[in-house]
Amino acid sequence: MMRNVQSFYFLFLLIVLNFHVVLSAVCIGQRATTTIWLNQNGDCQDVGFCQYLQNCTCWHGNLVVKSTKYYDEENFKPYFPKLREITGYLLISLCTLKFFHLFPGLTVIRGGDLILNYALVIYYNEIKEVYFPSLTAILNGGVHIGRNHRLCYVNTIRWKSIIKDIHQTGQYGIYLESNKLNCDLGCLKGHCHPAPGHDGDPKAQYCWGPGPKKQQNKAQCQRFCNTQCGPEGCLDGSDHICCHHECLGGCSAINSTNTCHACRKYRIKSTGQCVSKCPRKQYLVDKFLCQESCPYWSINSTEYHHYLWQGECVTKCPVNYISNNQTKKCEKCKSGMKCNTVCKYQDVMADGTLYNGALIRVPSDISKKGLVGCSVFEGSLTFQLQEGTGKAEDSLNELKSLKVLKGHLKIQKSSLKSLNFLSSLEVIETPQNALLHNKYVMAVYENSQLSELWPGNESIIVSDGGIFFQYNPRLCPLHIRNLQDRIHYKNGSKVTGEVSLQNNGHKVLCDTQMLVMHVEEFIPPDLNMETDMTAIECNSFKCVKVTWNFTMTSAYNNILFYAIYFKELQSNQEAVVQLDNECQNNDDWNVITVDIPKIESLEQSLFLQSKIISKLTPYTRYAFYIKEIVSKGEERSSHIHYINISQDLPSEPLGVEASFLSENKILLKWRAPSKPNGIITAFKIYYNKPDYSFWEEQKVLDWCSRDASRDKNAKDVAGYPVNKENYNQYCNISCVCDEEKENSKAIKADREAHNFNVEFQTELMRVLFTKNKFSYRNKNKSPPKIDFSKNISLILSNKILTSTSTTVTQAKIEIIEEPKVTVNGNIFSYVISGLDYFEDYELKVCGCTVVGCRRPSSTINLDCGIVQARTGVNLTADNLDSKMVRVQVQLDSYNISWIAPHKPNAVILKYEISIRYALDKDALVICRPGYLPTYIIRKSRFGNYVAKIRAISPAGNGSWTEEIHFKVAELSVTKNNNQLIIGIISAVSAVIVALLVFILLYMFLHRKLEKDVQGVLYASVNPEYMNSKEVYIPDEWELNREKIELIRELGQGSFGMVFEGIAHGIGDHAELRVAVKTTNENASIHDRIQILQEASIMKAFNCNHVVKLIGVVSQGQPTFVVMELMGRGDLKSYLKERRPDDGGIPLMRQEIYQMVAEIADGMAYLAARKFVHCDLAARNCMVASDFTVKIGDFGMARDIYERNYYRKDGKSLLPIRWMAPESLKDGIFSTASDVWSFGVVLWEICTLASQPYQGKTNEQVLNFVLSNGHLDYPEGCDYQLREFMSLCWHRDPKMRPSFLEIVHVLENEVDDDFVMVSFYHEMKRKALEDIYMKSESYIKSDAYTMSDGYTKGDGNMQNMLSRSQNRKSAIEKSKERLSISSLDSGTYVEKYDANDTPEEIPKKKKRPRSKRNSAVDSNACETKPMLRVESLYDNHDAFSENMQYGDTPVGKSDLMHPETNRELRLSEIFYGKPIPV
């Protein structure tokens, strides 16, 4: 019984365990790389293979996913959820899928094979989003994601957590380039945080997409596992429960080797179990799988035989072992037995031809191409190792076992210093057809670093051919001679050596005989099927044809071949052939070898030879010369010939950058192309919105449950890494001659990136367009093919290299895009305006030469610079119109409707409707998606309600509308009487509505008839062309239109454009520069009346610190208002120009106080004239050419001569950020409210035109100011200016200082020019003159106040007589520093002395004003000692009894603190106590 229970329990455990077991299906491709073809609908083109791959959990090999233009009627969607492991690389390119979700279960990419060091490549696709939610490990190789102009969520992945090889750094590690910029990235709120050990920021988020979506309710988070678990990974659904140590990348059950997603070492193919070593009777295959037999063990197949060696299946036996085809084993060589490890390899060259041998470009090619441990290599070996590819000698030592080479040996343009790795070479058996140039068994040439060969005295036996050593500047000829003595043919004779003693080692090249050569640019003929490949290349590239004479001489047998040398030169540079030192050598010459012609008859004595050289740089000067390479005797060469290659289309501009300037402007910058290929005549700019926008997914994404988040990682510059978490700094170390160094690091970086992209694209082309097939393809269908005869040049230019066929598929028609802007070739920036708010734009810059212009191309070869940018935010674009919000109440429900914003920021994502029941404290906020109709209908209980609405866009939240109050009435009737009551209510409502409409119409017409000029409707026969003189009476200010000449636009005014112009014959001026305000052509009559009313207001002003009116042109259209020209524009723009961060000169302290005094003086003048400005701000203050600041823009000014304040009616736009609390609350505008605005202007000056209340909406500003709030004082600003602001922002308008008082305090801070022309000093001088005249006449008077005029006292004659002499003396002293203002603001009179009388003062001679000093004062915003508050005059003693503020006399003693004996602060003078700042 117990045994049965134990058996049952064991069986139960086995069932539970097997429930978690994932059956492993390892699939092995018949080729190293297999392609998944997708048609235009995204269906599998090869259904057989896709069905086969769907059942695979591991793919042994490389996978390529790409689309084809060809279409088969299949409906098989690619989806491979079981695939968890790829042993090679994964390439996704030329794919038109929108969302790439093909491999949701892919966990590990081993990187056994790489594309230029990359294991995952996503390149040049139209994919918007990739999704690898299970990917946790890339064992070898890096990640390259580039040229995907729609792909977002690239930088929200922490690639460093996926790449496991810490040595994969720099551009060969993680390279993310030219993907979609300005993505609005945001992972699902509250999700996607990394596990411990991956990121120091616990709030960081990493995800593959926004999530959730309707199709899948997932957060799309990147999968993380606690780093303490190591590479084995975590249990599915957990980030801290570790898997078995034999696992890799994760598992589906813990403590089990059967549930691993991938194996850390080996996997048993039959069961999927992960093991550290293969069990008995199973063999290790490809260092990856354990299986019962080696693959391809077949009697009929010997090509892919595997052999057993120490429990492993190998394709070749190691050193000292020999393969036995009978036993399929590697047997150890017996003593005295000749034991060789035979290797062979067939390489593919860049042009697609096969090379019977191995081409070694990088050290890793030794192991990648199976050459490690080879003793016999059947094929040729070519070494072209470039500098910077690693320690080549260490990797090449793996070839030290090479003894027999059955091909030629070629070492060319290599960075090798020694050939010691060939020290074991004994035999070179080269077939006749394998000789290099049909002559050479060994060729070593153009190796700049090679200094020694290999040591030893052993002989080397060659079967045929000779040796060739040329242009090895560091290789001593003695070494070559020693090696040559050791090389013998099989018959014992020494090998012939074609070795030049002139160009091996440090020798100077010299010629005794000259060859005749001719060079000309080659124009290819029309293409046809008989055209050779060289001519086809010349159709796309520049070519040169080199021709020379070959003369038959007795030395014919000594000529090996001809070498054509050529190189690029500067414009007028001469070429020099020399080998002087390390930097100036012959390595900068390119060389092409040409075989000598075959002599059919000895009677021929003269031959004409030619060679076409292609791929030359257009618009470049080249030098050419040709030389004979001989085995012995003298070498002949030609003179150096020069040729200028013609122009061609330029390459793409470099450094294309875009940044927003405002809500509808983008600044586009670029640099000249790296290959201009001629003189750049123009640049054509294309821009449009991308055909895909992230916000178009608003119908799929639930924005009511998420917040819109901008990409905070995105940089302004396109094409550079944006997420520093995924990048390591790198640099290329190489020897560069001083004269070749770039002047600009940015240009050098651009060129290095360009060269790297060329290298990567070349390797990518080799992978993408290599012929490939798979055995599971449907046999009833032929693969896609192309007819080359249709368009050879198109095939070459687009690199479409596929199989040939007799069937032709219709090509996709490309829409030609027209340029939006064309600029000159010497311009490298442009401001694009008129764009939509907060929208993404794709901008392209294409260069032009005299040959033509590049155009944006849809192919992988990009011809234009491409960048993406987004415009700025319009702060009011998302605001809803409160007037358009409607509420309809129907019994127990209500309907709220509104009108969407006309031009929002990007798109409205959602609306928030706040509804509060009158008896409830909190409001209910309802979300309405932006794509739905703008209304909501809700059931409700009876009572009063308050509602408001706001719109939310990608730019943020709009302002709330005004609150709407409505009531849902209680139902008090029975259900049976509902219809009757509704009918009665409807009838009564219709009658009431009709009466209301009639009454409103009557009132509207009646008011229209009674309006005055500001609102009168003037009748006219032709109202749209109404003449201004019907509403405006010309006076002495009227000017002749013909005397006004408009020059250029200055900007937009209140009613139309503002122009700079010249007024001819105005007053004493022959020509006077003026500013001219005009109305728009389509301006209404009301606008024309308004501009004339503004001009009428200005007629009353004559102050140096108020913009002056020159005249009016009211006759005809358009109306002109001619004003004084303010050459430096408005104060706000001028302050921005002075920002040090933007290269401006900071304001000095004197300038700040001068500006403040001039503004206060101008406002004091307006206050004295009983005018309230209502819109005082830095934008409405103007700066003249001599830096004088004046008050301007009276569009809102009102005359309040008979009342002290103005209550504004209506609801027009108001400058809320500058308005006083009483203006915001009650609509009261007065001089005191202008003082509040003046304080805001002070704040603008101190912050150099920053936005007041930055970060707050208008609604928030309104509530903040009404809640006793005001602006924060600028940091580091002068203490007195801060105290001025505090005084101006007093809550009680009566407690704010007047403008004259402000100027009085600043009197000692202004320059002499201000004293001559200010309104304040003019009032002061009038008071002085009045006192002077009355003192002379002994008029009975009391003390006078000098602040705003003078007042009479008690008339004490004796006191007046006793003080008159002192007063007169003080006046005469004060007059020495005063001068009288002239009516001409541009001049002032000379100073008068004490003997001048008031009648003599105006007779003084005028002289020009001095320019203001604009020197830099770095301490302009630092705290200064307190201003000295003095009396109106310098002499305290003389006038201490005559000073007063209001009704309180102020003397010298009153200006001192009674306890500390210090000077009083401004607030202490005005209010009697300090006001805290």
Swiss-Prot record:
Membrane topology is: Single-pass type I membrane protein
One GO term in the molecular function aspect is: insulin receptor substrate binding
Q: What is this protein called?
A: Putative insulin-like peptide receptor
Species, as recorded: Hydra vulgaris (Hydra)
Q: Where is the active site?
A: 1175
Question: By which gene is this protein encoded?
Answer: HTK7
Q: Which InterPro entries match?
A: FN3_dom, FN3_sf, Furin-like_Cys-rich_dom, Furin_repeat, Growth_fac_rcpt_cys_sf, Ig-like_fold, Kinase-like_dom_sf, Prot_kinase_dom
Q: Which residues are glycosylated?
A: 55, 255, 300, 325, 457, 491, 549, 644, 732, 791, 874, 895, 957
- The Protein kinase domain, residue ranges: 1044-1315
Per the UniProt entry, what is one GO biological process? glucose homeostasis
Briefly, what is this protein's role?
A: This receptor probably binds an insulin related protein and has a tyrosine-protein kinase activity.
Q: Which cofactor does it need?
A: Mn(2+)
Which family does the record assign?
A: Belongs to the protein kinase superfamily. Tyr protein kinase family. Insulin receptor subfamily.
Tissue expression, per UniProt? Answer: Expressed in dividing epithelial cells.
The enzyme's first-digit EC class, named in words, is transferase
| A cellular component annotation (GO) from this entry | axon
Q: Which residues are the signal sequence here?
A: 1-24
The regions listed as transmembrane in this protein's record are: 981-1001
Extracellular-side positions = 25-980
